Structure formats: C-alpha cells, structure tokens
Amino acid sequence: MTNKKYSKALKRVEDTISAGFLMEKIEAERNDRNKSAFVWPENESKETCRVKLEIGSSVRPDPFSKRSMKTYIQAYLEEKGMQDVVTEFDLQEVKVNTLDITRTFLDKVMSVKRHAICGTLPRKVRHIYDVTVLLDRSDIQDFLNDTERLKQLLKLTKETDSFYLQKRNISEDYDPLGAYAFENWKQYFNDEIRGRYETLHEDLLYTSNRQSFEKAIQAFEFISHLFTSIGE
C-alpha cells in the first residue's frame, strides 16, 4: 500500500477505537504510518482520565509470537460463571501476532542508548528498569547465550532502527549501527537519572519496592560486554 492508503487505514482504526470519546491529536507524533492522540470519556476530565492512544504500522513484529487475548470484562464474566452474558455480547478471545520478547528486549536496550545520547533519557528512565528486569528472565538468558541467534537479531534491530530513524530529527551523535559501548555514554546515567530511577516505584511500577540503580548499571555493563564479545 502507498503511504496515503496506510494513513487512511490507520485513521479508520483510530476512529473506531476512539468512538464515543473526546480526542486531542498529538500532531508532533502523527504521520502516514503513525497516529497518536489523547482520548477521554465525554463526561470526565481530560487531566485525570486521558489515555494516550498510539496506532502504528512502521515495524513488522519480527520475530513474532502468536498470543491469545481477551478483555478483562470477558475474563471476569467467565470467572463468575456468567457465560450467558459473554454469549449475548459475543465476547470472544482473539489471537494476535505480538513482537517476541527477545526483540522487545533488544529494542529496549538500543532505545536506552539512543535516548541517552539524544538527551531524552530523563523522560525514558522506565526503559532502564524494563531492560534490568527482562535481563533476569530465563528466556532472555537463554537467548543471550545463543550467540548466532543474538547476532542475527541484533543486526536486524540495528538495521531497522537505522532505516526508520532516518525520518526522525535525532542527534547526529547517535549511530544506530555502531558498537553498543556503554562505557562511552555511561556518564548519562547521572544523579538526575539515578534520582528518577529510585523513585519509579512511586508512580510507574507495579511494585512498592525501591529499585537499585547499581543493579541497573551492572545490567548495562553486562550487556555491553556481551555485545563487545560478539563484535557488536
């Protein structure tokens, strides 16, 4: 499809999802392949009830995993034995292709470096947490131990970033194809970032536990050392 056809298709999806809600478009984040807007119920305050709606078609989920999804309402009704209501409203479980967690991990790893060098890391500190937590997962450890698979997917991630970042106004100091080399931009993990990281549990995490910034630094040092060992 052409870019204009993509834009029209995404607009139809956006209109369907936002039907019955008030909407404020985020023009700086809208183009033919991406639509961003804040939406909120007509009888509620925008300041307290708005949700950011993001719809995009820039990147294919590669590699992907097929996952089943159902609404919380359907799950609740089934738990309460109200199958007649589920049937009445034709609530169904759907299967969707989702980005495999290994690619999600690498996307997060690369985005932290990009935001650090481009000066936007203070707004993306949650990414540091995501990388640190994902690194502890057994499936991520298995992935990192598979050198051939890691090199292949890291190459794909870098090349994809390079292609799409050409269309965005980012710092020329960031090279998406370059070596990870955490030691060259570690200075951006400064006191400001530490302070925000150690207070994430107050508003952004599903835990009340204060996070260790030292553990986060160690995670990125480990990742950088591993990437260096495979020439990345």
What are these regions (language model features)?
Residues 2-232:
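Structured mid-to-C-terminal alpha-helical surface segments
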